[in-house]
A protein has these predicted regions:
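N-terminal presequence-like segments and adjacent domain-start helices
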Residues: 8, 15-16
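Short, low-order "capping/linker" segments at domain edges
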Residues: 97-103
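Short, well-ordered beta-strand segments in beta-rich or mixed alpha/beta enzyme
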Residues: 2-9, 40-71
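An amphipathic, aromatic/His-enriched active-site/gating alpha helix that lines ligand/cofactor pockets
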Residues: 17, 23-40, 58-93
């Protein structure tokens, strides 16, 4: 499994729209679901810092994720620009695999 984590600081006036767009049934998840190797998205709200969220995007493999992005780069960029105004900041925390899964 391959997991990508993103951290967001959300504009308070846009929070409901953000949750709808970035949640497990939101537009990002629907976009990624075109790939059979996409396993799902979780949206976590920070209990200690209001307006801060994490997304966890799960894929079968790094290759599946990279391949999807390569094939759909312009659509990804268009969707990213569309939702840019919902956040005050967006940080890619990292990409992770299951420990011990390789070799």
């Amino acid at each position: 499994m391959y997991i990508i984590l993103w951290r967001y600081k959300v504009d308070p006036a846009q929070e409901a729209k953000f949750v709808k767009a970035y949640g497990p049934k939101g537009e990002w998840a629907r976009f990624f679901s075109a790939a059979k190797e996409y396993l799902g998205t979780e949206l976590l709200a920070d209990d200690e810092r209001p307006g801060e969220y994490l997304t966890i995007d799960r894929w079968e493999s790094e290759e599946a994720y990279s391949g999807f992005l390569g094939e759909h780069e312009s659509d990804y960029d268009r969707l990213d620009r569309r939702f840019e105004a919902l956040t005050l900041s967006e940080t890619r925390v990292g990409a992770y695999g299951i420990a011990g899964a390789k070799g």
